[in-house]
Amino acid sequence: MAKVVGIDLGTTNSVVAVMEGGKPTVITNSEGGTTTPSVVAYAKNGDLLVGQIAKRQAVINSENTFYSVKRFIGRPSKEVSDELRQTPYKIEDSEGKIRLKCPNLNKNFAAEEISAQVLRKLVNDANKYLGEKVEKAVITVPAYFNDSQRQATKDAGKIAGLEVLRIINEPTAASLAYGLDKKDNETILVFDLGGGTFDVSILEVGDGVFEVLSTSGDTRLGGDDFDEKIVKWLLNEFEKEEKFSLKGDSQALQRLTEAAEKAKIELSSLSQTEINLPFITANENGAKHIEKTLTGEKFESLCSDLFDRCRIPVENALKDAKLKPNQIDEVVLVGGSTRIPAVKKLVKDILGKEPNETVNPDEVVAIGAAIQAGVLSGEVKDILLLDVTPLSLGVETLGGVTTKIIPRNTTVPTKKSEIFSTAVDNQPNVEIHVLQGEREFARDNKSLGTFRLDGILPAPRGIPQIEVTFDIDANGILSVTAQDKGTSKQQSITISGASTLPKEEVEKMVKEAEQNAAADKEKGENIRVKNEADLYCYQAEKQISELPEALVNENQSLIKESKETVEMLKENIKKEDYDKIKENLKKLQEKLMEIGQKAYAKKEPLKDEDSNKAGSQDDFIDADFTESK
């Protein structure tokens, strides 16, 4: 069976892993790292940049560089008004749906499309690593993601050309990685604080069985929020000192955000850090700079409300699992934000024990996803995973009340039914309004979709029997069926309308992505050929200039032709005539080989012993060009 990869599609960084020889392995990306920034950018000429190369140019191209897009996936505009104000790139409301504005392409993107580009980059790296085409994946999502966010993540996978075999909760994936070889039963708490989301799950782990007892979380709390606190502090300090604001300067905001993230990371191991941003802006009085010292104490003071928010899901998860802190055997930290000293202290204070730091918080989720991928492909045996639904599911009933059909923390997959009736005499149809959440009234919960069951026979209210069935699959995605028991008529809905993209739009994006993939591949090949030709021109000129005089005199025609070919090739490179570049590159390679053979036959060394070193660096230089595609 073809390899199935596990992907941690993160807010800040993403990771891909695979089972090899029965062991999970994190795949190194084309830049040589194991984590790929979840950043996508479009250059002025329309080129697509993904990962580290996109992140590096964010300051000079802030309006066309998209990051932390996971915070928007599967969510309507009204839910993310706070986040909209924090991004240097523009976000538009398109009939209640979020669209990311890209001025360089004069185009708007759905969050799913941007996430799909990150997935495509991960899969391309996996293809190169494995030497085969990857078409199937397990993708992780925060445990507290609702139905629409899960469906949107599947859509992103589809747009990227992937068959998403399973959506798995991030803390559950982490527990798989932690507990793969554990024989003794343990109760573990996974504390997962990533770039944009926070989850807490409590599990029973041991002897191949992973049972989730409870889960809680906050999908609007993560490392980005800690960065934002530092940014606000820097903005306020600057405004106090300079008497004008940087809030409308997207380039300055991007530099501040990057500096804030760097400072946060440094404070994980230092007691204080320096933030230096020269030439952040200028006015009539000249250039302005930011020079600030941020101490660990000041950082904790700025973020005190965020640390308080971290407590609530831990307490809720313990309550739902009916456990006391001393009944937790191990605490596993997941996500880069758990490196913050105050977070570790918070965990220790709540649970009364030092957290387990034996797993890599950046890679553990992808490793768990790879294990689940191995289970689905038959490569991993004797693993039983029992996950839960994070939020209650139900329908709206008379008076706008939410009637729960599947309570939160129910093990999935699951199927449950309830009988409902009509509210008025001779009611010909019923509208089923599907809801997700814990609040009493429908208006306070997340609306997942509505559908109508027609053809109910005339009868006094309360007489017709309408059976509503909720069916949650292993991905945590819901389908709902309503059946009139009297007529056997039924109507159903798979809650995919909760995604921000209709099915037809997803299909269109899949086709566009496939077309662009071919174009991107061709563009990448052209860049490689152009770089190679440029290198050969340099080598040829250097080699010819260092030839012994006697050899030059004996081969004047060959030397002249070689020089002419170099000039033609340079002209081809300038005009980006790739067919001619390939043609003349081949000619130049042949002529250089002929010169080399004649020099070797003469057994006369070149003037400069280092002349061959340019050739020996061929692979290194080419790899450098490959990195910057």
Curated annotation (Swiss-Prot):
Acts as a chaperone. GO terms for cellular component: chloroplast. Keywords: ATP-binding, Chaperone, Chloroplast, Nucleotide-binding, Plastid, Stress response. This is Chaperone protein dnaK. Belongs to the heat shock protein 70 family. The gene is dnaK. The keyword Secreted does not apply. It comes from Diacronema lutheri (Unicellular marine alga). It is found in: Plastid, Chloroplast.
